[in-house]
């Protein structure tokens, strides 16, 4: 009889303890009988894939996106931005055409995930003032890029009283711009309770299929479909903050190149 790590059923004349036979099910118990306690017994995390339920095996995302081929390539962007109340934008899908591990082979590739690492901070003069400043980040997909540079924050988002925390994509641009992820970070200035910098560490799965034209340069104007943009804006009108970020994208080349 195979050995199992789950709960067992004990019903003998000596012991009248009845324990539920559920074999470490992560779902909520429906019985009132006492169960054997264990460490992290409600999770399937540390169990091999063939011993997980069928739901975990069927609906698992593929390692390589559909229509793409390996290896997984990496492109990094290191930048320092002056984040103002009016907002700033950076294109994070700029990849040069080439044969290296950081280049795209052809016109099409898929960005599977993005890693945003860094911090936001204030300079010596601003951090002495009593205020709280929040930086709003919007990871946006531009489905139909047009022009030599991305549209500004105020051109894409509709805000109440010019407040970035109330920003939503304008109605006439909703079919073009899609907000995929949104997050924020907070810094506090003043003599008491100062938090002059805030660390950022975010990892998102995006699965964005980017299409370029015949040009080789990594520019926004060479995109034809699905440019990935990062919009940033701070909530304080007069005190800007600085963002020192390292943005890394993980992408796969398309088979149809």
Curated annotation (Swiss-Prot):
InterPro entries: Gem_coat_AR1, GV_A/BR1_coat, Viral_coat. The keyword Metal-binding applies. GO terms for biological process: symbiont entry into host cell; viral penetration into host nucleus. Signal peptide: none annotated. A motif (Nuclear export signal) lies at residues 101-122. It is found in: Virion; Host nucleus. Transmembrane segments: none annotated. Keywords: Capsid protein, DNA-binding, Host nucleus, Metal-binding, T=1 icosahedral capsid protein, Viral penetration into host nucleus, Virion, Virus entry into host cell, Zinc, Zinc-finger. GO terms for molecular function: DNA binding; structural molecule activity; zinc ion binding. A zinc finger (unnamed) spans 68-85. GO terms for cellular component: host cell; host cell nucleus; T=1 icosahedral viral capsid. It holds the Pfam family Gemini_coat. A motif (Nuclear localization signal) lies at residues 40-54. A motif (Bipartite nuclear localization signal) lies at residues 3-20, 201-248. Encapsidates the viral genome into characteristic twinned ('geminate') particles. Binds the genomic viral ssDNA and shuttles it into and out of the cell nucleus. Plays a role in protection of the genome from degradation, virus acquisition and transmission by insect vectors, infectivity, and systemic movement. The CP of monopartite geminiviruses is absolutely essential for virus movement. Homomultimer. Binds to single-stranded and double-stranded viral DNA. Interacts (via nuclear localization signals) with host importin alpha-1a. Belongs to the geminiviridae capsid protein family. This is Capsid protein. It comes from Tomato yellow leaf curl Sardinia virus (isolate Spain-1).
